[in-house]
Regions:
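Conserved small/polar residues in nucleotide/adenosyl-binding loops
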Residues: 1, 184-188
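A general structural signal for short secondary-structure junctions and capping/turn motifs
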Residues: 3, 28-30, 49-51, 59, ...
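Extended, low-hydrophobicity, Ser/Thr/Pro/Gly-biased non-transmembrane segments
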Residues: 17, 59-62, 73-142
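Short alpha-helical segments and helix-capping/turn motifs at coil-helix boundaries
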Residues: 22-25, 42-44, 99-103, 109-113, ...
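Acidic, contiguous internal or C-terminal segments within carbohydrate-active enzymes
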Residues: 4-63
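Ser/Thr/Asn(+Pro)-rich, low-complexity disordered segments
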Residues: 137, 142-145, 151-157, 167, ...
Length: 188
């Protein structure tokens, strides 16, 4: 069996909220073929139990890339993939949603991760998450005027996105970039 390489450079940025004496760490890891980041909530006096209401991670695209996507849906992933430009997602969404009794689409431009894209220059971009433990799964909502994706977490019945206890951390938000689409399926 072959071991996976896990070589990266790391930067941890601590943001302090002085009025409430709380902080959060945003941890970045840069790899040869992409990056990951996550939010960490250290053990601290003024933060114990808390509720995630929203997450606003954003991914700005450099162009109107070709995307391979399925509709963002809280209840099912049983869709065929649609291939389109990012700017075409809104117009194609209604046709991409097939008849199914358990569907909860959240936006006319919302897609599920993993989202694969191809640039005009032949680069492949993949947006996804990793180490999803005790946290809501991430979809992506596209601002199709500015070509910016924003994280969209699956809510519970009352709209909350997570019940947390410090110390804790979010899943990794991942961006893989490669000129080889097989990189995503390669075991090495």
């Amino acid at each position: 069996y072959k071991r996976q390489r896990n070589h990266y450079n790391e930067l941890a940025v601590t943001l302090d909220q002085k009025a409430q004496e709380r902080n959060i760490v945003i941890r970045f890891r840069l790899y040869d073929d992409g990056l990951g980041f996550r939010y960490e909530f250290p053990l601290q006096k003024n933060l114990n139990y808390f509720v995630i209401k929203e997450e606003h991670s954003q991914f700005a695209m450099t162009g109107d890339h070709t995307a391979f996507w399925i509709p963002g849906d809280y209840d099912t992933q049983e869709y065929d993939y649609t291939e389109s430009k990012l700017s075409e997602i809104r117009g194609l969404m209604k046709g991409a949603i097939t008849g199914n009794a358990s569907q909860t689409s959240f936006s006319p431009t919302g897609v599920q991760t993993s989202l694969q894209m191809k640039t005009a220059d032949g680069l492949y971009i993949n947006l996804h998450e990793a180490a999803l433990v005790d946290y809501s799964c991430m979809h992506l909502n596209l601002d199709d005027k500015n070509l910016v994706f924003e994280s969209w977490l699956t809510p519970d019945a009352v709209g909350d996105k997570g019940y947390m206890q410090a110390p804790c951390k979010s899943p990794w938000r991942t961006v893989i970039v490669s000129d080889d689409c097989l990189l995503y399926t390669s075991p090495s």
